Amino acid sequence: VNIDPVLKALMAALHGEGPAVEIVQDENGGPQAVPVETGVEDAAVVVRTSGSTGTPKATVLTIDALAASSVSTAMALRGEGQWLLALPLQYVAGVQVLVRSLYAGTRPWVMDQSNGFTPEAFTAAAEELTDKIRFTSLVPTQLQRLLDSPAPETLAVLRRFNAILLGGAPASPDLLATAHAEGLKVVTTYGSAETCGGCVYDGEPLDGVEVRIGEGELEGRILLGGDTVAAGYLDAARASKAAFFEEDDVRWYVTGDLGQLSDDGKLTILGRADDVIITGGVKASASYIQSKLEELDGVTAAFVAGVPSREWGQAVAAYVAVTDPTPEGIKGFTSRREAALGVLAPKTVLADKELLMLPNGKPDRLAMIDQLSKLHQGQ
């Protein structure tokens, strides 16, 4: 994949010598930097939110925000190095691989994903890296594939990375335990397009990033503040006003997540603010049910949502990734889930080898909810 034209346009935008750009796919599936008129001073990059919970929004990132993000990332990772690109460039995590490379003065290596993400292609790309200090960004699904019966050469290249940033979706405790047992330097990240990507590493805010928990109307919400926060959404004044605010010269972004801060300032993400399911008058947390399902033998990932139900108002439904999606395997899972969750056990379940995913590695919530709703209604 030739990314030189994209790097050139991105460098011009970051230096204020060219227009802001959005990286999109061209007709051949390759990356293309398209100039965007934002009306925002010092705008450098426009990235789309993933759209996992609704319509994707075009987020405007400034030169200063991206510079602050790169500097704080380098401080957290104790240096700059060469990056391997294994994520789509139209989303913030992919763009940031290029941005960090440009600030570091190193050449990123692009993984060949013409046949999708495979351990073989990742290993081949990682073997091409030349810098002693190496980084990559992955989503949990990718790391799971790399660690499922890994070849010795795959483990060897994974261990060579000074840090593997893991974000886009929560990583299961089992996946993190496996990665650490194999000697991988995995760093869990939390953030979004609105914060130039990950701005909290292993629960700790990056330098210059502030985290607090909302009160009043924003009770329990995670609020992220500091120099990495976006200028706003393109052509969406109402959405920008709801998501961003200024206070004491600090710009803040209101996330859709609930969290808590420990006494020493470590952030724990508790789940989405909209994840409460009211079924038959009983309140249930989708993230709690998801975590219980993921503790069951044979379950590698789970997604839980409420779907419309004539009988219950909402019914608990789950899409689960299982190691054995045969009828016999699913029968065993059914008895285990009822034993673990009782009345909160999902009434409607779809099981497959993997969850439905968006191109950026986040769960495709809308697609899974649609399928679960149809199944629950007998369609």
Where are these regions (language model features)?
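AMP-binding/adenylate-forming
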Residues: 19, 61-69, 82-145, 187
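Conserved ATP/PPi-binding loop(s) of AMP-dependent carboxylate-activating enzymes
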Residues: 205, 216-244, 284
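AMP-binding/adenylate-forming catalytic core of the ANL superfamily
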Residues: 226, 251, 258-343
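Conserved pre-ATP/AMP-binding loop-to-beta segment of ANL
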Residues: 31-48, 80-82
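Conserved C-terminal "lid"/linker of ANL adenylate-forming enzymes
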Residues: 277, 304-305, 317-321, 335-379
